[in-house]
Amino acid sequence: MAKIVEFDDKSRRSLERGINTLADAVRITMGPKGRNVLLEKKYGAPQIVNDGITVAKDIELEDPLENTGAKLIQEVASKTKDIAGDGTTTATVLAQSMIKEGLKNVAAGANPVAVRRGIEKTVSLLVKEIQTVAKPVEGEAIAQVATVSAGGDAEVGRMISEAMDKVTKDGVITVEESKSLSTDLEVVEGMQIDRGYLSPYFVTDQERLVVDFENARILITDKKISSIQDLVPVLEKVARAGQSLLIIAEDIEGEALATLVVNKARGVLNVAAVKAPGFGDRRKAMLQDIAILTGGQLISEEVGLSLEMVDLDMMGIGRKISINKDNTTIVADGGTAEEVKKRIAQIRKQLGESDSDYDKEKLQERIAKLAGGVAVIKVGAATETELKDRKLRIEDALNATKAAVEEGIVPGGGTTLIHLSTKVEELKGSLNNEEEKIGADIVRRALEAPLNQIANNSGVEGSVIVEKVRSTDFSVGYNVITGEYEDLIAAGILDPAMVVRSALQNAGSIAGMVLTTEAVVVEKPEKKGAAPDMDGGMGGMGGMGGMGGMGGMGMPGMGMM
């Protein structure tokens, strides 16, 4: 495959054109009065969105050099989304401004390496400043962060705040599409495993077709049980104690399952059995989680424990257990809080060391189940187009809220970046040469871009707003909704510090890379050939008729031998 190779300023200008095309489409969505973008879909109705990352991912340009520039901005947006969950439009606007100013200076003769160094030093200083000014988030502020990120939707803010309150910051909150028109919150308390009862004969509530136990013993084992002799000692001990029993095992089959069903039917013992969740090593880890949560032990031959050795103290206790045909939910107080915390810390360490997105997701689920619950926000809307847009907004709001809990909050609406620009002047005195100072100035000017864009999108002159905000106190900024200058923290217009930090770091990183690019190598697109002449083509096919002569080489010819 042939390649196109471009050098020097020409290569950088090609990248800039692609960057500007994508960034201009993304920036119009910024702020509470941001405009919508309509995306054509190959199949189905067009999608109307107000979400920067969705717009960015959907753009592919015809010119391969420009498309490479667009991909760089997609990378900025995606990286910011991965780290902080929100702030993709802010990162895009910052990167576009830094690249534009930087390329002007490089074209005028500035040393791109020194300029890049100046950008990196300035961004590093500003990141420390953001961490210094961030305030911890609590109470009402959680709902306010979610409301701002959801485009001013107070109902979404309240729902996310309620979900975080119920499942804690370690819990899992998921967003799903609902078949109804309303948006609702469902919270599952305790640990839920995706395994239901092994036999419908275990059901205790015939109307709801569920098994309900209270203060039941839980036998947890990684063994496959097929002989009833393995279970007899356990069943006798539980029956004498007058308690219900839940058995979680790799599998229970044949004689063992049949005997449990008969005992349940005769009223000898209130019992139910479910298969262990997961597979392989993950299954053992999840069984150990259940054991720690319920205050029991995992009965495994690997640690020298067999079913004959089990007594009541080795079993867990479930304060409330509910089992349907698909899921088992255990609410337990049996485990000590200290042991559960240790287990969560251990899983969190594994989470930090893992490179696999799938493994990370499963480890996060395990933390949530140990921490106390899963909340599901079911999103409803009148049309599919509105539903998709609303779901994207809620996901953004949820990610922003998690980021705020992690690293705290700062005044929103681009205000923090404006006030931080004064720190750049202080830094310039410590920089080694004039070209590094140019890098610092590039960042300082870029810090104005987010507020400028938010104001422009709301129909007011951005440059006027920027100058006015620059002269106010740190927490005072421009409220686009009311058109007033006020204390944004008091007004509930907040940004997660992690979002602002990640947007700035990723924008600075990509700007430095573009400025120091001296050559771009891309694949040369294949020219689409002209449509073939149908008459000529068909005539050629006619020649295939000669193949009919091959018949003469067949069996009759062989007869001549």
UniProtKB/Swiss-Prot annotation:
Subcellular location per the Swiss-Prot or TrEMBL entry: Cytoplasm
InterPro entries (UniProt xref): Chaperonin_Cpn60_CS, Cpn60/GroEL, Cpn60/GroEL/TCP-1, GroEL-like_apical_dom_sf, GROEL-like_equatorial_sf, TCP-1-like_intermed_sf
Chain residues that bind ATP: 29-32, 86-90, 413, 495
Sorted UniProt keywords: ATP-binding, Chaperone, Cytoplasm, Isomerase, Nucleotide-binding
UniProt KW Transcription keyword: no
EC number: 5.6.1.7
Cellular component, GO annotation: cytoplasm
GO molecular function: ATP binding; ATP-dependent protein folding chaperone; isomerase activity; unfolded protein binding
One GO term of the biological process aspect: protein refolding
Pfam families: Cpn60_TCP1 (PF00118)
Keyword Isomerase attached: yes
CDD domains: GroEL
Reaction(s) this enzyme catalyzes, per UniProt: ATP + H2O + a folded polypeptide = ADP + phosphate + an unfolded polypeptide
Function: Together with its co-chaperonin GroES, plays an essential role in assisting protein folding. The GroEL-GroES system forms a nano-cage that allows encapsulation of the non-native substrate proteins and provides a physical environment optimized to promote and accelerate protein folding.
Homology family: Belongs to the chaperonin (HSP60) family.
PANTHER family according to UniProt: 60 KDA HEAT SHOCK PROTEIN, MITOCHONDRIAL
Stored NCBIfam families: GroEL, PRK00013.1, PRK12849.1, PRK12850.1, PRK12851.1
SUBUNIT field: Forms a cylinder of 14 subunits composed of two heptameric rings stacked back-to-back. Interacts with the co-chaperonin GroES.
Name of the protein in its database record: Chaperonin GroEL 1
Origin species: Trichodesmium erythraeum (strain IMS101)
Origin organism lineage: Bacteria, Bacillati, Cyanobacteriota, Cyanophyceae, Oscillatoriophycideae
Gene transcribed to yield this protein: groEL1
